[in-house]
Amino acid sequence: MMQASFSICILSFYLLSFCHGAPLPAFLRSVLSGNGMKEESRVLKRSAPVMQDEIPVCAQNQTDRYSSSSRLCRLVKDLGFCDFDDLYQTVLQSCPIGCGFCRVEDGNWSVWGAWSPCSATCGDGQRSRSRSCTNPPPSGGGADCLGVSQEIEDCNRRSCEGIGGWSNWGQWSACSESCNIGIQARTRTCTNPPPTIPEGACEGFSFETQICSTSGCNVSASVSTAAATTSPVSSTAQTQIGPTVVSLTAKQQACLDAHNAKRAIHGSPPLEWDFTLAMNADEWANELAVTRQLEHDPNIMNEGENLFKSAGALECVDAVERWFLEGKDYDYEDDNKLDDDTSNFTQLVWRNTTRVGVATVVEVVSEGSVETYIVARYTPPGNIEGKFEENVIKPSAEAL
C-alpha cells in the first residue's frame, strides 16, 4: 500500500557475495527504461580469487536509498551471478506512478566560464577556466559528469625583453565629496621598467576609481562623478579630485593638450580630464581589442564617443590628428547634418563638451605585429541635430 508519509524509497534484495563485512560499493550504472523499470548495477570486489563453490549466500540485506518522493518503491526482481573474482549484482526495480526515485537524470556540464586573466604579461603565464556539473546536476541516482571541471593553459609566452612593467599604485586621493558619497582615484605608471619596444606597453589600467563615503552632512546621499580640473596647455597640469591633486600621466597630458589645441582653432573652450570617462573608455577599448572590430558601444549613455584603430603602436595624439583631418570635408552650412565621415571631428571641437577621458590599448595580434585601439569619451555629448551651427565654429583666418 502506498503511504504518502514515506520520504525514503526502501529496497530489499538478496546478495550473492562473499560476506566479509565490507561496506557495499556504490552502483556504477543506472538506467531508466521506457516501461517504468529502473536497473542498477555494481561490482562487488573480493580481496582474493576463490572458487565459485566457496562463495556462500549472504543473508538478506536491506538498504535505504534516498528519494524526494512521498511514495513507496517496490522491489520486484533481484538477480545476481558470480565469477571467480567478482560478484556482479543487478537490481531491477519497478516504480509506481509518482515515485520520484525512478526519475533518473545523469549530470551534464555547464558551459565553460570565461578565461581568467593571464598570471603574467610575458614569459610563462597561465590562465584557467572552469565549469560545473549543474546542467542539470545528477539526480535520482544518475551518473556524475565525466571529465574535468577546470582547464589550465599557457598564455603570454612572448619574451619579456623590452616589455614594460607597472609601478606600484599611488595613494588614493581624498574623497571628491566632503560628506556622504563621492569618488576617489589612484594611478600607476608603466615605468618599472619602461617599455623599450613598440609592443611592450603595459597591459591593464593606469588608473582606477572607487566609491568613497564620509559623514558629516545631514542631507540625502548622492554620487558625484567630479571631473579633473586641468590646465589645458601646461606640461605640469594636474587633476583636482576633492582637496587632493593627482597628476596626469605624460600620455594623458599629451592627449588632453592635443584635444585643446584643436578646439582652440575653432573657438571652443578647453576640456578637462575625467577619470570616470577614461575608465569607461578603457573598458570598451579592451572589448574592441578582443573582437578586433571598430564599432560604437551600443550601451553607451550620455557620453559622446570617438574611435580609432590602426596597425602598429600609435598614441592618442595620432588619433586626435586623424579625427581633426575629417574637418576638411565638413559642411558648415548644414545645421542638421550628422555625417559619419566627419562625426569624430565635430565631437572633437563640439563647443558645449566640457570633459574628456581617453584610453589606448595595444593588442599583440601575431609575433611582431600589434594593433592600436583608442576610445575617447566626452560629456556632455556632441553631434546633436540642430545644434551644429552653434557648436562647430568655422575657424577664423588667424586661427589657421
From Swiss-Prot:
A Pfam short name: CAP
Cellular component GO terms held in the UniProt record: extracellular region
Subcellular location: Secreted
Domain SCP: 256-362
Boundaries of every TSP type-1 domain copy: 106-161, 163-218
Cystine crosslinks: C118-C155, C122-C160, C133-C145, C175-C212, C179-C217, C190-C202
Domain of life, per lineage: Eukaryota
CDD domains: CAP_GAPR1-like
PROSITE patterns to which the protein is assigned, alphabetical: TSP1 (PS50092)
Keywords: Disulfide bond, Repeat, Secreted, Signal
InterPro entries xref list: CAP_dom, CAP_sf, Compl_asym_regulator, CRISP-related, SCP_GAPR1-like, TSP1_rpt, TSP1_rpt_sf
Signal peptide region: 1-21
Record has Ligase as a keyword: no
Tissue: Component of the acid-insoluble and acid-soluble organic matrix of the aragonitic skeleton (at protein level).
Protein name listed in UniProt: Ectin
Organism for this UniProt entry: Acropora millepora (Staghorn coral)
Lineage, broadest ranks: Eukaryota, Metazoa, Cnidaria, Anthozoa, Hexacorallia
